[in-house]
Structure formats: structure tokens, C-alpha cells
Amino acid sequence: MDRDYISELPDSLLTQILLELRTKDSVKTSVLSKRWRNLWLNVPGLELFTLQFTYPDREEIFVRFMDRFMEFKCRSRLKKFMITYVDCKGYRDRLMELIGTLVDHGLQHLYVFMHTFDRVDFKRQNIYKSKTLVSLKLHNVELKNSDFVVSLPCLKILKLENICHGEDGPLVVEKLISGCSVLEDLELIRPFDIRTHKVLLLLRVSSQTLKSFTLHFAIYKDRTDFSVEIDAPRLKYMTVEQSQSDSIVVKNLSSLFSIDIGTKFNPLRHEDLRMRNVFYDFLTGISSVKHMIICLWSLQRFSPYSKPGLIPKFQNLYHLKAQMWSSSTHLLEAFLESCPNLKNLILEYNVELDREQVDFTNVPQCLISTLEYVEIKEPNEKSTIKLVNYFLENSAVLKKLTLRFSYSSSIYLKSYKKLLTSTKLSPTCQVIFGC
């Protein structure tokens, strides 16, 4: 008979193993044997989704489950509580009491995802004065009043998504940030509804400890402008997605290692001289970055930046991933001119059928001295061949050029190889065709 090694493990180790499972799967182990019957109750984490409870008695079963859990008196051992809550009308107030109780008993990780027609007011004072919370993630809750005290001395991770605020939305967010003295990771996804405000909103993100920051606003047609000011001297990783902001002002970002710019500055104001200056200042503020992902379409209507020399120098940038269109090669050329030490270049190429490709006119310094790896995704045989030949003919130290086709475009592979007629400037360069 095979030996049951798992049953020989101590309870402390088994509960850590069960912690890696979702709670609904952890509960299923209670039927294995008498020893396993209540073992799941000792797991220091609880992950719940109210829709997983059986319909039509979902609400009653959920309430009984939570009552049993609390009666077992394991609340003091719980370190992580995650709940995805879909309306259980009879339990909403009790849920808030439960969360408050768990926080008072030393909870470290709290994730609350509310899916209700009426948002839940999530302003319990003890939550924002917790001495043990390390991570806090809130989705679709209400924080309308900025008149509350925040003191979270251990909080390192904060995520706010789709939060409902009153007119003091930015102040609420700023208060949360300022009350986290060791905050390292901040993610703001639609942190307040920009459609409901009639005046310019200014969000200040100021932190001496922040290392990673993600900002994502939804795109709305009818909305007010907003501005973001970021002051974070230890920031290493930054992502700005689809914000269409009026301006993004950055200060003290000398530690910045990587940035992902998916944002489009206010598209109605690209011809505004002030906006051009704001955008130039933004690029200057991130010029120490080493790794960048950018959509060159973000620069498309800032026509002065299509000329070499008018983009700030990125002396430290060695890895660039850019999404570009066939008509924006002049922007790529200008951007490469500002990256004299670039080593790795990844291009996601998009074809504009009604636009002609603009030829390169210069050879940037990085092609002459530093560029070693180029990858072009989704190349099109007619519009991309000039670009490919340009890199092969002008990159003196290029080691590898990879053309990555999708499954649907792999039929062009053979004909594409025939079109590559240029002489490689770098004799050791490999041309790789892949999917």
C-alpha cells in the first residue's frame, strides 16, 4: 500500500498549502478525513465570491457560511481577506462589520471588489488607521467625504479602481497616499469619475517611498480636463494608460527605470503652444529612464517633434518598444535621434492603407554605435521592406534583426525573404524569421 506522505505533514504546513487554493477548493478538502474536516478554517486567508454560493438560497448560504467562520474564532489568525461581492442585500452592513473586525484583529491584506447597484460607503475609521494592513485593494466603493483620518504605517500596496467620490475626489486620493508612509506600489484605475465634474481637476501624487505607479483613466467624450502632478524621487516603474489628460507634470524622477506611455494628451489641444511645452517638459522629466514603451501615435500631432533635435535626449535609454504606423517613420527617426545609447528596439508595426510611408533621411547615432537587436512585429511586405532594409544597411553593430509574423501573415514569409536585397553593414548580423 502506498504511503500517505501528505497526512504526515504538520497542520501548519498543510494550511500554508491550502492558502494557495481558492477558498471554495480549500473547503472541499474537509471530506477527505476527520483530520481534514476543519483544517480549512485554520487557513490564514479567505477568498470568497458570493455568486459561487448556490442559487436561489445564495444569500442565506453565504450568511451561514460567514457566521460559521466567525464562530470558529479563527478571525485572529486571518491575514488575508478577499471578497468579490454581488448584492446580498441582507448582509451588506454585516459584511462591513466583519471587515472592521478582521482589521482590528491584525488583517494584513484586504481586497474588496463590490458589484452592486448602490455603492457601499467604505469609510470605516479603523480600516484607515490599521497598524497591520500591508496591501489594500478597493473596487467600486464609495469614498465621498475627505474628512477622515488616514494612518497606515505598514501599507505598501494600494489599488483604487472605479471609486465614487464627491467634489473632493482628488483630495480623498491624496489623503490616502499621504497617510501611507511606506507606500511602494500605487495603482489608480478610474480613481474618480471625470464626467461628473465641471472644473479642472488636479491630482497630486507625492510620495518619498513610492517605487511603482500605474494611472489609468477611461476615455470619455464629454468630460472636464484634468491634470496630474507626480513627485516621487524613488519611483522606478511608471505606467500611464489612456488618460487623455490636459497635462502630466513630473518632478524628481531621477530613479525612474521603466515607463509605459500609452496616454494620449488632450487631442483637441495638440496645436496649443502651451500643450507642446507641457509635453516637452514631461519628456524632459522622464529623460533619465532606461526602458520605455511608447505609442508613437501619442506624438503624431505634436508636429514640431517630428524633427530630429527637438525631442529631449534620453542618454540612459537602452531598451525601446514602440507602436508605430506606416506614416510615422519620421517620428521614429526623430525619437531614435534622441536615444544615442539605444541597444534594443522592438517595433509593433501598423499599416495605414491610405497613407504612404515616409522615407528615412538621416542615420541616428545609435545605429552607428550601439543598436544591437531589432525586432519588428507584424511586418507587411510592401510597407515594411524599406524599414527593414534601412536597419540592415545602416546599423554598424547590429547582431540580430527579427521579423515576427503572426499565423495569418506567415504566408508572406517566402516572398518577404526574396525582397530582402540590401547589403548588411554589420557582417555578423543574423536575420531571423519567426512567428
From Swiss-Prot:
CDD domains attached to this UniProt entry: F-box_AtFBL13-like (cd22160)
Residue stretches of each LRR repeat: 88-114, 138-162, 165-190, 191-217, 250-275, 324-349
Mitochondrion in keyword set: no
Domain F-box residue range list: 3-49
SMART domains documented for this protein: FBD, FBOX
Keyword Repeat among UniProt keywords: yes
Any Pfam family: LRR_At5g56370
Domain FBD residue range list: 355-405
Key words, A-Z: Leucine-rich repeat, Repeat
Protein name according to UniProt: F-box/FBD/LRR-repeat protein At5g44980
Organism: Arabidopsis thaliana
